[in-house]
Amino acid sequence: MATYAIGDVQGCYDELRKLLAEFGFSRKKDNLWFVGDLVNRGPKSLEVLRFVSDLGERAVVVLGNHDLHLLTQYEGFERKRQDDTFDDVLEASDARALVDWLRARPIMHADERYTMVHAGLLPQWSIEEALALAKEVELALRAAGYRKFLENMYGSKPEEWSVSLAGWDRLRVIVNAMTRMRFCTPEGRMEFRAKSAQPPAGYRPWYEMRRGRERPIVFGHWSQLGLRLDPRASCLDSGCVWGGSLSALRLEDRALYQVACGGYKAPGGD
């Protein structure tokens, strides 16, 4: 039995199936970790959601920014963007079931060996603290009044964490750190505009602020950073939807598996 962490799929269903064949995935023995952004930009978001949801407990999925965007679109709180490609999900006969399955996913996951999050973790948070904060968001997403949370989720303010934050501001900072952040200051002030691997003045990649802290982290979200196999923090977003590759890391021995992707979008997005 093995566990494979897989980078941002973003609707690239054919490439996902090729990757699983590449390492001989067994539904009876193996587990899959997905770093988020199952949907959008690629052509087959519906197939991806149906396949991954059907894996049951064999698949652990953390929510990414595109997954949350799908939820807000479905509930009518976000206008369609020109490059959105999940109409197949919105128009599907099983859309409600898939959306409910998606919003029941965590935004952070950890076991005794590894931690997984889509974007990053702020330097002030220990793994245990971050898991507790993630649980606050997960409870809001799963509550009967979850639509109110989705309605108030978006925004880039506040830019930094404080234990005194409450209400929508508190939940928004947690969501932004775990699904949108790339750079922050040592004090935890986040920056959301830059997407390249080069930090803006005064900022550093979030993972550089966590050197020597706790168990290793696997994450995605950062195609312009690309594949980064560091024992402390590994980025598995190798830009499949942009013409790069789809990557999987076997967590037991850190063996890497990749398949080439044809690319559905011009490089440079998120």
Task: Identify the meaning behind each predicted range.
Residues 2-10, 114-120, 235-236:
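Active-site-proximal beta-strand elements of phosphoester/diester hydrolases
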Residues 12-14, 40-43, 66-72, 109, ...:
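Active-site environment of divalent metal-dependent phosphoester hydrolases
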Residues 131-270:
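Acidic, His/Gly-rich catalytic cores of divalent-metal-dependent hydrolytic chemistry
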Residues 8, 37, 52, 64-65, ...:
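Divalent metal-coordination and catalytic microenvironments
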Residues 1-55, 68:
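N-terminal active-site segment of His-dependent metallophosphoesterases
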